[in-house]
């Protein structure tokens, strides 16, 4: 365990310094300088992702409590910068959440920072129905998705893109930050469209193993010859033919 941090730690781990051997992979979130340092060393070492600001979408219906929703939006916004977005098809919830946000922000130590984040990166969105709400969520592909409904499982089949999904009124996103168990290193900035959260599989490698005998090689030789001829790579064909003389 090394007591180091920041961009300088990324450099030390990527290239090695006295007392620290270079590594093959660097993972985990950090500030802007850490993110840019990881981007710079990628290729010399592997990385997990370029982590952006924290973000949450709350997908809520008429059963959601406005104070619960507001608390989840603020909890991510207090990272500053952080993004908090509510998508609902129950119009009265928009005004109720806006009022709850104002009340809670003045009561919190980091309320000023969270308020600034919500002004710059927050949104309260009214969808036509649950299907449109799910489509908008998929387009945004959030790091955290909180489905605040009595039957949140009903939305899972409509959602493809989210780093971590929190179901029900009593599953705040903070559980995933600290206690719940699944990876907290999650795709941000819309990258949940193609990326997953960090997992044990990210620390494993695979190698393909191929073995043919002479009979199997003879059966496939003509296919190799034809493709090699198309590409003009005669040595490829020759490496097969020399074994079949």
For each feature predicted by the language model, list its residue ranges:
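Short, well-ordered secondary-structure micro-motifs
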Residues: 14, 37-39, 69, 96-98, ...
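Short, basic, helix/turn surface patches
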Residues: 1-13, 26-36, 112, 173-178, ...
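Electropositive phosphate-/nucleotide-binding environments in soluble metabolic enzymes
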Residues: 3, 7, 31, 50, ...
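A glycine- and small/hydrophobic-rich beta-loop-beta segment
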Residues: 75-78, 86-162
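Structural motif
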Residues: 1-2, 23-27, 31-33, 48, ...
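Conserved NAD(P)+-binding/catalytic subdomain of aldehyde/semialdehyde dehydrogenases
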Residues: 2-84
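Gly/Ser/Thr-rich active-site loops/lids in small-molecule metabolic enzymes
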Residues: 49-55, 82-87, 91, 95-99, ...
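C-terminal core of ALDH-fold dehydrogenases
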Residues: 138-245
